[in-house]
């Protein structure tokens, strides 16, 4: 128990001789260092706030302006046009013996220079914002850049400093524009034309016209008004109504998973892998806090919004009866760990020092070696986060609002993130196709009680050292967690490394206090609620069919030879595969980002178009020449690319209609058109997984350093969820989900149709493939 006593700064006991105080120098040292570290963080935040506030200016540029003003004065040149003299006359008289005419003159010049500097910053920032409103570059053909775009790019570079911080561009990003109602309705009708017969389409046209003429103008005015004062007219409502107000389980329905590197393995030692990975994660968090991470830039010059990254760590979704809330802390010095039905609190720091990988390995090994059994009700406690939100909110209020249960729950909810240590082993074996699907299922839902689905993300560790993530969706979208994951995996492989036996480098400090077991007092009534939530979650998990596979014949290398966008190629293949699978077309959702705007998140690309359906029907007929099919395919691909660009530049369909619908609800206005649009099911929900956001290594030199992406559950009960990652020149990973309870869907069958569709389209271009 010596380590436990070190954690107490002082103790006192009352004896017949008086009060006996005992101080722990080591504990006091840690308290002191922790305080110093906290003040350092505050000072860094203040410094970054100042630097961010004056961007694209800098303290250096301020000094340059002052020196220019002072220098011109010494040369008897008044560049202020008399303003310095005016400021000098306005300064109060007799403010001390040191206020000589020279100091008054210098102070006046400093005030003038500061005013010029601030005015220049405002001008440059507004100019940069205007330049970032230009999106013509997105619609130009690859390799054919116009002179206007060249001039625009040169101006962007001139106004951007060479070393921007993570949030430097936030105030320069333009706001998401509100599209014209007529344009949105026109694009909507165009998107549903291939899905409706003539009679249904005519009825929808009438509904749309009635809405546009009678209801929409009033709703649009309120929406435009909101866009003037809000940072983003969509994002706050999207977070609240799509995510936080959802009452169904987060598991499968909302949370998504991310896979590890699957073609290489750095170590088989579970604790060692965790030591490196968690050390890398906290290094990333430190860079995030200090804003040292470079903002993601399109073309290397167009900044993407970094707002979502703020809540990556120290964030938990707190359940409520009507709506959940996101609780975000400025800092957290520990992680919560689950192993064999027990919860632990593991400190990440010793005083002000971040634990080294070998120390973290030792701490996790202590947890793995701990033989203590779970407390009553503890083993399946996390099932509360996997079940219904109302039941969890009621249980939280009834059983976790006081005493040791409150303290233990706070240790989890206030952790930097959650770590799950599994006893099973999962990995990808190319010789065993089912292995990737089993791995994905374990990440998506586990056994329904070994993940804390409310945390911003859960780091999942399998017995063989393989890892993965399960991420909550409300706080951010997949590219944000992907940015972290790329950094962590790259740091693990190329910077930290392992010994020959697979352990972390260096010797650990055995004097570290071991992780702390969280203590619970869970009554029988609460245990019954836990079991009920577990049964709900288990039924949901058992109904999910997940089929993951690596497509080996080709990747983006061959697709580029077909002179088309890789994303458009895959999306059209999905349309062909779906028609072969179901014999009909369906409303298709593809997620696109709107992060070129301030606080932008996503927009929907409706991938099922008249052009893509024409190509699919021609393929099914089998009577067209390859030249005709290629022409139809190129038209479909061009249409898809244009729709994707429109979505990225704020001219999408669904977010605008979603916000108009919410305004109608606030105003108590009934709209049959909006009600029907918002109730249409997405039977094919798709998403491309981003990669190479951080260039930590050359993929050509390390072709096996590939992650397999990740996936999510089906959006509709009778539909498919498809995510895909075009992982390299010669491979694509697919993750397909559906429900066993639907007689119309089968994930593996759909996967086979996708394979065949990709090969059939590639054959149209007669480009040799890696494998047949």
Curated annotation (Swiss-Prot):
Molecular function via GO: carnitine O-palmitoyltransferase activity
Record keyword Metal-binding present: no
A GO cellular-component term linked to this record: mitochondrial outer membrane
Record SUPFAM superfamilies: CoA-dependent acyltransferases
EC number: 2.3.1.21
Known catalytic reactions: (R)-carnitine + hexadecanoyl-CoA = O-hexadecanoyl-(R)-carnitine + CoA
Binding residue positions for (R)-carnitine: 589, 602
Tissue occurrence: Strong expression in heart and skeletal muscle. No expression in liver and kidney.
Membrane topology value: Multi-pass membrane protein
Active-site residues, Swiss-Prot/TrEMBL: 473 (proton acceptor)
Mitochondrial intermembrane side: 74-102
InterPro entries to which the protein is assigned, alphabetical: Carn_acyl_trans, CAT-like_dom_sf, Cho/carn_acyl_trans, Cho/carn_acyl_trans_2, CPT_N
Pathway participation: Lipid metabolism; fatty acid beta-oxidation
Enzyme type, top EC level: transferase
Keywords per UniProt: Acyltransferase, Fatty acid metabolism, Lipid metabolism, Membrane, Mitochondrion, Mitochondrion outer membrane, Transferase, Transmembrane, Transmembrane helix, Transport
Localisation per UniProt entry: Mitochondrion outer membrane
GTP-binding as UniProt keyword: no
Residue ranges, Cytoplasmic side: 1-47, 123-772
GO term, biological process aspect, one: fatty acid metabolic process
More info: This protein is produced by a bicistronic gene which also produces the CHKB protein from a non-overlapping reading frame.
Biological role stated in the UniProt entry: Catalyzes the transfer of the acyl group of long-chain fatty acid-CoA conjugates onto carnitine, an essential step for the mitochondrial uptake of long-chain fatty acids and their subsequent beta-oxidation in the mitochondrion.
Family designation: Belongs to the carnitine/choline acetyltransferase family.
Protein name, UniProt field: Carnitine O-palmitoyltransferase 1, muscle isoform
Source lineage: Eukaryota, Metazoa, Chordata, Craniata, Vertebrata
Gene name as annotated: CPT1B
